[in-house]
Amino acid sequence: MTPKSQAINPLMQREIAQHYPSTSITAILNLLSQAEAGYLTAQAELFTDMEERDAHIYAEMTKRKMAVAQLDWSLKPNRSAGAREKRAVMDLEELIKDTFDIETLVFDMANAIGHGFMALELQWGRDATGFWMPKTFNPRPTRWFTVDQATRQNLRLRDNQSIDGVELVQYGWIVHEHSSKTTGEPGTQGLYRALALPYLFKNFATKNWLRFCELYAVPIRVLFHHEKDEGKKQAILYSLQAMGQNGVALLEGGTQDDLKTVDSATGEGQGFLNLIQWCEASVSKAILGG
């Protein structure tokens, strides 16, 4: 038997991932509903955004994946195995340890924790003795995959011919499906589904916190002047603005040209920080337990 690699649509290999609004509850809920109906692409792209845009999700998920990847492992023969079979298992274990970076392989497969599944494409080649051996394990983006519409249980490769995609080539893939709950299809088992709303709420809070800082953290500069020429007044205003962000004012009057720095207006931004902390605590509980 000659192992084969999957023929992947070159257009899909050059496909650019879409990015989805991180402040729209309706958009995110629609993506999750589409995945329940068997359309996984948009959800997969959202999950990738979550990993890349939220440092807390990235850090906590990395902790969990590293904890799995660093575990010791071994191959055990069947209890009824004879001496020859036991020796074959020992030889296979030595071959795997000498040939493959299992820690990296397991770390890559652990992406299934968040996404619900992970598929690594195998590239085969012959070794020095002529035996076929896997040469590389290439993690493929989860947006490349779909499920059959009849059962929504069988992971398949997307193509341009059918919404069911095409079957994965035998011996061409290592597929790990992770179950974050007791029932469901591969597209609904990812832990990131539970993190989508905390991720959304944190984005709300972060953007509002940045607006708060912009409004209340910049001193206000006020210049009282007696200049009548509009051109000169505009030049003075530009000079003030060049001193920093636009917390400036140009007012006519006063006894002399006088630059005043006014203390920033008081405000309370703790509510935004509390929401951010709650979202991060929820994420940590979901990923690491607690």
Regions found by a protein language model. Give the residues of each.
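Short acidic (Asp/Glu) and glycine-rich catalytic loops that position anionic groups and cofactors
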Residues: V68-D72, C213-R221, G253-S264, G290
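Extended, low-complexity, charged intrinsically disordered regions
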Residues: K63-A67
